C-alpha cells in the first residue's frame, strides 16, 4: 500500500517537473520570435474607429492593416464571420491574421453573452469598437466595465468572467502559443453544440492564416 502511494507521488512529481520544463521551453521559444504586430499598435488603430458603426470601423481597420503589414492579412475572399461557442458564451469572430505565435481577429456579439474567459498560454487584448465589456477578475469581488475606445488585457494564465452587452464589437490581438488556445475555443463546439460545420470553418480559417504566413515567409509580401 505504502509502495503504491509512493509511486503515485513520484509520478506526480515527474509530471509537475515535466510541466515546469515545458513551460520554460515555451516561454524561451516565444522570446526568440519576431512578431508582426504589437499590442499597442492594434489598440491605437482600433481606437481611431471606436464609436463608428462597427462594420464601417472594421472595413477601415482592415484596409489600414493591409497597408501597414502587406502579406500578413487574409484577402477579402478568405474573410468569414464564424460562430464561436466557448466557456458558456457565444459570439462570432472574423480572423484577419494567424500564425503559431500571433493572431488578429474581429470579435463580437449581436445579442450579448457571458461566460468563462478561459486560461491561455497567451496574452490577449481587446479594444472595444462599440457596446460594453464587463470583466470580473479571479480573486476579486467587483467587476469592471469597459467602453468604446478602451482596451481589456487578459494575461497568460489568467481567468475571468466576461459579459458583453448586445451589439458589442471589438478588435482582438493575441500573442503566445496560439495553437494552445484552440482547445478552449473549440471545446463547446465539439462536446456541446456539436456544430461540426462551424468547427470546420474555424480550422479552415486558422489553416488559411498559417498558409499565408508560410507563403509570405518563403516568397515575400507580393506573393
Curated annotation (Swiss-Prot):
Sites marked Important for ligand binding: 126, 172
Free-text comment about domains: The C-terminal helices form a flat, hydrophobic surface that is probably tightly associated with the cytosolic surface of the endoplasmic reticulum membrane.
Lumenal side: 1-9
Cytoplasmic side stretches: 31-223
Residue span of region Important for ligand-binding: 99-106
Entry keyword Glycoprotein: no
Topology of the protein relative to the lipid bilayer: Single-pass membrane protein
Domain of life of the source: Eukaryota
Record-given protein name: Sigma non-opioid intracellular receptor 1
Span list, region Targeting to endoplasmic reticulum-associated lipid droplets: 2-8
Cystines in this chain: none
Subunit composition and interactions: Homotrimer. Forms a ternary complex with ANK2 and ITPR3. The complex is disrupted by agonists. Interacts with KCNA4. Interacts with KCNA2; cocaine consumption leads to increased interaction. Interacts with RNF112 in an oxidative stress-regulated manner.
Role, per record: Functions in lipid transport from the endoplasmic reticulum and is involved in a wide array of cellular functions probably through regulation of the biogenesis of lipid microdomains at the plasma membrane. Involved in the regulation of different receptors it plays a role in BDNF signaling and EGF signaling. Also regulates ion channels like the potassium channel and could modulate neurotransmitter release. Plays a role in calcium signaling through modulation together with ANK2 of the ITP3R-dependent calcium efflux at the endoplasmic reticulum.
A cellular component annotation (GO) from this entry: postsynaptic density membrane
Note: Sigma receptors are classified into two subtypes (Sigma-1 and Sigma-2) based on their different pharmacological profile.
InterPro entries reported in the protein's UniProt record: ERG2_sigma1_rcpt-like
Lineage: Eukaryota, Metazoa, Chordata, Craniata, Vertebrata
Major subcellular site: nucleus
Residues covered by region (C-terminal hydrophobic region): 177-223
Compartment annotation: Nucleus inner membrane; Nucleus outer membrane; Nucleus envelope; Cytoplasmic vesicle
Pfam families with a match to the protein in the record: ERG2_Sigma1R
Entry's transmembrane regions: 10-30
Gene it is expressed from: SIGMAR1
Annotated keywords: Cell junction, Cell membrane, Cell projection, Cytoplasmic vesicle, Endoplasmic reticulum, Lipid droplet, Lipid transport, Membrane, Nucleus, Postsynaptic cell membrane, Receptor, Synapse, Transmembrane, Transmembrane helix, Transport
GO biological process: lipid transport; regulation of neuron apoptotic process
Family, similarity comment: Belongs to the ERG2 family.
Amino acid at each position: 500500500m505504502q509502495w503504491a502511494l509512493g509511486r503515485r507521488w513520484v509520478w506526480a512529481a515527474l509530471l509537475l517537473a515535466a510541466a515546469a520544463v515545458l513551460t520554460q521551453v515555451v516561454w524561451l521559444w516565444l522570446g526568440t520570435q519576431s512578431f508582426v504586430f504589437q499590442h499597442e499598435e492594434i489598440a491605437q488603430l482600433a481606437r481611431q474607429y471606436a464609436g463608428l458603426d462597427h462594420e464601417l470601423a472594421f472595413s477601415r481597420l482592415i484596409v489600414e492593416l493591409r497597408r501597414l503589414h502587406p502579406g500578413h492579412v487574409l484577402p477579402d475572399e478568405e474573410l468569414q464571420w464564424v460562430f464561436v461557442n466557448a466557456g458558456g458564451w457565444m459570439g462570432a469572430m472574423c480572423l484577419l491574421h494567424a500564425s503559431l505565435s500571433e493572431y488578429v481577429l474581429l470579435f463580437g456579439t449581436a445579442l450579448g453573452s457571458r461566460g468563462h474567459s478561459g486560461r491561455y498560454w497567451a496574452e490577449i487584448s481587446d479594444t472595444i469598437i462599440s457596446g460594453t465589456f464587463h470583466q470580473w477578475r479571479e480573486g476579486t469581488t467587483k467587476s469592471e466595465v469597459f467602453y468604446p475606445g478602451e482596451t481589456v488585457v487578459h494575461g497568460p494564465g489568467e481567468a475571468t468572467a466576461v459579459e458583453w452587452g448586445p451589439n458589442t464589437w471589438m478588435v482582438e490581438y493575441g500573442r503566445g502559443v496560439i495553437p494552445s488556445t484552440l482547445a478552449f475555443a473549440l471545446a463547446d463546439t465539439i462536446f456541446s453544440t456539436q456544430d461540426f460545420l462551424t468547427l470546420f470553418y474555424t480550422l479552415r480559417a486558422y489553416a488559411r492564416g498559417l498558409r499565408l504566413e508560410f507563403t509570405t515567409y518563403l516568397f515575400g509580401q507580393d506573393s
